[in-house]
């Protein structure tokens, strides 16, 4: 081992499976060492002290040992590259995806709200149409009620005429002259003018003069009797023999007995 010679007496070094096979006889040692240096196994020269200690035992020799070289995997390289600025850029690109998702959800929510509002508008329109129809039906019913009221008033007047109520005339009895009329002013309203249908105060019956030439208000009398003058001939002329007016009694309801003389 001295003088820089190689000591191959250590069989453990060369018998190791990691050393591989010895070089063939036609291969030089230089090529062998180059192969070792190019391989993961490496050779180095260092100085160490062997037991027992002493200056005469200090020597230098070359030993062979395995250098383990850890190569990063491709996936590890990708992971490491993800931490660079490019990875930050990729993370920045992912943020718009989240924003898009939020925008999409907001739009869907807005569309759902708009759809619900449209449904509410349609429902309110239907209710409005129903209310309009009800109002139209109510107006029709009110018109029908008014028509029936008018018909009732007309029928009541006709019934009152049959029993002798004013303004309808009850047919006269057989013993009363034909030119005489019997009137009952019970249903005469205020401010209604009453006309005697026969000749009054020397006026022809065709002209239809009013009492006192001005007409008589229904509120100014209690009982008015138009009676024929029995002393007159049957020429159709007649006069009042008795006119009884009373302002104190102004009753408008109830039937009063009519008298004819």
Curated annotation (Swiss-Prot):
Domain bZIP: 89-155
Record Gene3D superfamilies: 1.20.5.170
Database matches in SMART domains: BRLZ
Region Leucine-zipper, residue ranges: 117-131
Ranges of biased composition (kind: Low complexity): 237-248
Segments for region (Disordered): 1-22, 74-100, 237-261
Segments of skewed composition (Basic residues): 249-261
Protein name, per record: Basic leucine zipper 19
Upper classification of the organism: Eukaryota, Viridiplantae, Streptophyta, Embryophyta, Tracheophyta
């Amino acid at each position: 081992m001295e003088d820089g010679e190689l000591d191959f007496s250590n069989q453990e070094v060369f018998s190791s499976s990691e050393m591989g096979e010895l070089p063939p006889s036609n291969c030089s040692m230089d090529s062998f060492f180059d192969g070792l240096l190019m391989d993961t196994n490496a050779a180095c020269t260092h100085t160490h002290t062997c037991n027992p200690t002493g200056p005469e035992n200090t020597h230098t020799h070359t030993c062979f040992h395995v250098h383990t070289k850890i190569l990063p995997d491709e996936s590890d390289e990708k992971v490491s590259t993800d931490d660079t600025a490019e990875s930050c850029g990729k993370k920045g690109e992912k943020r718009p995806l989240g924003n898009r998702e939020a925008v999409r959800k907001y739009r869907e929510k807005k569309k759902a709200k708009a759809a619900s509002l449209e449904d509410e508008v349609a429902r309110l329109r239907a209710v409005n149409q129903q209310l309009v129809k009800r109002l139209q039906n109510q107006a029709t019913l009110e018109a029908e009620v008014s028509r029936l009221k008018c018909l009732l008033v007309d029928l009541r007047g006709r019934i009152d005429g049959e029993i002798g109520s004013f303004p309808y005339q009850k047919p006269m009895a057989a013993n009363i002259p034909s030119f005489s009329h019997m009137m009952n002013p019970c249903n005469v309203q205020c401010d209604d003018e009453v006309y005697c249908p026969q000749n009054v105060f020397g006026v022809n019956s065709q002209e239809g003069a009013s009492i006192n030439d001005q007409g008589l208000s229904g509120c100014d009398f209690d009982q008015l009797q138009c009676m024929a003058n029995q002393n007159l001939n049957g020429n159709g002329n007649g006069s009042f023999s008795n006119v009884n007016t009373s302002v104190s009694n102004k009753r408008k309801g109830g039937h009063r007995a009519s008298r004819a003389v």
